[in-house]
Amino acid sequence: MAGPSNQTQPPPPVLTQPSLSFTQGLLVGQLSVVLLIGAFIKFFIFGEAPPHPSRNGLSNRTSSHRRSYSLNSISADSSPRTLREKPSTSNILRPVPSSSTNTRSILRKTYYSATPTNPTSKHSRSRPHHSSHQPESLDWFNVLIAQTIAQYRQTAYILKDSPTSSILASLSEALNNPEKKPSFIDSIKVTDISLGEEFPIFSNCRVIAVEDPNSDGGRLQALMDVDLSDDNLSLAVETSLLLNYPKPFSAVLPVALAVSVVRFSGTLCISFVPGPGTSDQTMSPSPSPPKEASAENIAVDHQSPERQSARQRAPHQHKYTNTNTAGATAAATADDNDTHAKLPHGIPKTSLAFSFLPDYRLDLSVRSLIGSRSRLQDVPKVAQLVEARVQAWFEERVVEPRVQVVGLPNIWPRMGRTGVRGSQEETEAGAGGSAPADIPGTAGGDGVGVRGGGGGGGVGGSGGGSMRGTSGWGMGYDGLRYRHNAHGDGGVGAGPGQSAGAALYGGAQGGGGGGGRGGEEQFAIPGSMPDPVVVT
C-alpha cells in the first residue's frame, strides 16, 4: 500500500488575464455614453441645416418652391431677376397689382362683409346701399372726437385776448369783409360767442361700396349717424342798417341778432379719394357762388408768423413738456405744409372727402332786436330769413352732392415733430384722473362752481345755470363763452341752460355773487335804448 507521499496532486488552474484593464473599460463606457448623448442632441434636438443655395440655383427654382406675395407678386410674363442683375432706376419698387387694391380685395382681407343688397341707381350716380355687415359702435371714436373738440375749445379760450389769432378777430374779419358785405350794412360787431359744452355722438357706422368712374373697382364709403343736442353753440352780433338816400347815412337802424344751434342730426359720409395733386378739389366744380372767406382760413393766415417762428425753432427742440405742446403742434403743421408745397405738380395726394346726406336736421333758434327808440323783439320774418340763409350756406358746402375735400397730412416720422412725454404728464396720468394745474377753472376755490351752486364772486345765471367765478380767469371755462364788451372790462360767462338771445335783452335772472354784475347790466345792448316793445 502506497503512502500519501506517492500520490500525485493535480496542478492548480491557470487564471486567464483579461484583455482590457478596468481603467480602459471605464474610459470606453464613458466615451460610448458621450457619443449616445451627442447623437441624441444632433438628430432629435437640432434640425438639419438647409443646403446653401448656389448662385445659379436661384434662377432654376420651380414655381412650387417660390414664395408668392399677395401684394408684391410679379406678373407671369415677367422673367425673375437674379441677385447678380443690377436693377434699373425705373423698376426698383415692385408694382402693386390692381387686383390687390380694389374694394373687393380690401374687404376680403379685412374680413368685412359689405355686399350691397340694393342695386345702384341709374344716370351714373351712386346711391347709398345697406351693408350686410352688422352696424358698429363708435364709442372709442366719440372719445377721440370729444378730446379733439375739447382741445380746440381750450385753445380758443387761451387765445381769446390775442389781437390776431383769437376766434373773435377771425370772425370779425370774416363778417366785415368789404368784398362780401353790402354797402347798406354797417360794421358787424360780435357780442357773444359760445363754443358749446356738449360733444357730437356718432353711432351706427357701416361701410358700403359705391361705384366711382374715377376709381378702379369703385370706392368704399363709411356712413355714420351723428347727433348733437342740448348744447349752447351760439353767435350774437350787432350791426346797423344804413339808409344812404338821399344822402349817405340818412338814417340808421340798429339790429341785434343771436343764432343758436338747438339740435343737429344727420348721416355723415366719409371716403378717401385721390386728389389731382396741386388742387384740393377732387370732384367736379359745383356751380355754387365764389368761395367765401371762412373763419378757419383767416385764423390760419393769422397764425402764419407764429408757425414760421415755430418752424425755425423746431430743429433745435427735440423734447417738449406740457408747456410747449402748442409750439410743437404748430411746427408739425408747418412741416406738413412745407412737405405738400415741395410735391411736384401732377402727383396725386390722397384726400378725405366728407359730406352729409340730404335728410339732415338742423334746428336753429334766432333771436332778434330791431330799432332804437321803439324796438321790435323776435320778429318772425327776420328769423325765417336768417334760418333760410344758414340752411343755404350749409347745403352749398357739405350736403350731397357737394363734398368737402381735405388733404391728409404727412404721417412720416420726422425729428422736427418728435417729442418726449414730460414727467409732469406721467405724474398726472398716474394720479387717478386729477385735474391738471394748467387748465383754467379746475383748481382753486374761486373757479367754476357746480350747477346750482356758485363760486365766490360769481355772476348769476338763469335757473340751473352754472355760477362762474370772476376772480380767476374772469369767466367760466366749462362753457367757453365770453362776451365782447365795449368797455374793455373782460367777458362775462352765461349759464349753459341760457340761450344766446337772453344775452341781448337781459333775460338772465337771479343775482350774482359777491363782486359780480347784475343780469340786466351784463346782457344789455350798448347804447341808450328803451325797453323793447313785443310785437303781437
Curated annotation (Swiss-Prot):
Composition bias of kind Low complexity appears in 321-331
Q: Give the domain note.
A: The SMP-LTD domain is a barrel-like domain that can bind various types of glycerophospholipids in its interior and mediate their transfer between two adjacent bilayers.
Point to the regions of Polar residues compositional bias: 69-81, 88-105, 112-121
By sequence similarity, the record places it as follows: Belongs to the MMM1 family.
Sequence intervals crossing the membrane: 26-46
Where is this chain's protein located in or outside the cell? Endoplasmic reticulum membrane
Q: Write down what this protein is called.
A: Maintenance of mitochondrial morphology protein 1
Molecular function (Gene Ontology), one example: lipid binding
InterPro entries tied to this protein: Mmm1, MMM1_dom, SMP_LBD
Where is the stretch described as Disordered?
52-135, 275-331, 416-467, 505-536
Chief localisation class: endoplasmic reticulum
Annotated function: Component of the ERMES/MDM complex, which serves as a molecular tether to connect the endoplasmic reticulum (ER) and mitochondria. Components of this complex are involved in the control of mitochondrial shape and protein biogenesis, and function in nonvesicular lipid trafficking between the ER and mitochondria. The MDM12-MMM1 subcomplex functions in the major beta-barrel assembly pathway that is responsible for biogenesis of all outer membrane beta-barrel proteins, and acts in a late step after the SAM complex.
Which segments constitute the SMP-LTD domain? 134-409
The GO cellular component terms are:
endoplasmic reticulum membrane; ERMES complex
**Topology versus the membrane, per the UniProt entry?**
Single-pass type I membrane protein
* Cytoplasmic face of the membrane: 47-536
Q: Which residue stretches does the UniProt record annotate as biased composition, category Basic residues?
A: 122-132
Q: Which residue pairs form cystines in this protein?
A: none
Which UniProt keyword terms apply here? Endoplasmic reticulum, Lipid transport, Lipid-binding, Membrane, Transmembrane, Transmembrane helix, Transport
Q: Does the keyword Transmembrane apply?
A: yes
Encoding gene (name) = MMM1
Gly residues: bias regions: 442-467, 507-517
